[in-house]
């Protein structure tokens, strides 16, 4: 079993600048097949070590390595040397704190660590020792800046400057901004009016449809879903017709199908052993 400890030796060929360049290249690489997990109460990308090794064998990395071997070390064709070089690169990323070894927790383990299990994202905690095994998990602690980040900064600064210079705007622009703000307030007021009307209709309908639940119409602004999903379905009775309830049923069906599939696999494995 390979482990990274204080006594591990990384080759001199992979320095800090090289580690940063490699991390930038592979940060969002498709070979990593990254997933989202909750690490220190934040959504973070995590991946398996074997996926990182595959990314090092990708065409993108090979092209960079051919042009700049001093920054992107060449991966040897020999299997043993290949493993050593991959380990060397990854150890340097760990030492630079660009990747952090983690352990993925199951529901019961979450409760033991005082964490609330999440249906959408698995919880991750720091692993005391980085085991460079194929299925060990790691999270990124490195997020290179993208062109979109720069565009957002420029956009925010431009908006602030435009608002500060509002008194200098031409009369036509100020009149236009006035009508735009009125339109925005109108839309907001419309949403509140629909929500109030929906509530009144629901309460009144409870008298007639008490057994099945009150009658409601779209949109459900308080549903945990997107804008379009809040209009689906257009109307219904009680909780069973709501978007969240139907989504819950789908999740339960998927879990049930997965359990049955696992049972069949277990039965087949036992049959093969016998």
Swiss-Prot record:
The keyword Zinc does not apply. Residues 251-265 have a biased composition (Basic residues). Signal peptide: none annotated. It is found in: Endoplasmic reticulum membrane. Residues 170-183 are lumenal. Residues 2-149, 205-274 are cytoplasmic. The keyword Chaperone does not apply. The chain crosses the membrane at residues 150-169, 184-204. Keywords: Acetylation, Endoplasmic reticulum, Membrane, Protein transport, Translocation, Transmembrane, Transmembrane helix, Transport. Its main location: endoplasmic reticulum. The modification N-acetylserine is found at residue 2. InterPro entries: Sec62 (IPR004728), Sec62_asco (IPR011553). GO terms for biological process: post-translational protein targeting to membrane, translocation. One of its GO terms (molecular function) is protein transmembrane transporter activity. It is a multi-pass membrane protein. Acts as a component of the Sec62/63 complex which is involved in SRP-independent post-translational translocation across the endoplasmic reticulum (ER) and functions together with the Sec61 complex and KAR2 in a channel-forming translocon complex. In an initial step, the signal sequence seems to bind simultaneously to SEC61 and SEC62. SEC62 and SEC63 are required for interactions between SEC61 and translocating polypeptides. Component of the heterotetrameric Sec62/63complex composed of SEC62, SEC63, SEC71 and SEC72. The Sec62/63 complex associates with the Sec61 complex to form the Sec complex. Belongs to the SEC62 family. Present with 16500 molecules/cell in log phase SD medium. This is Translocation protein SEC62.
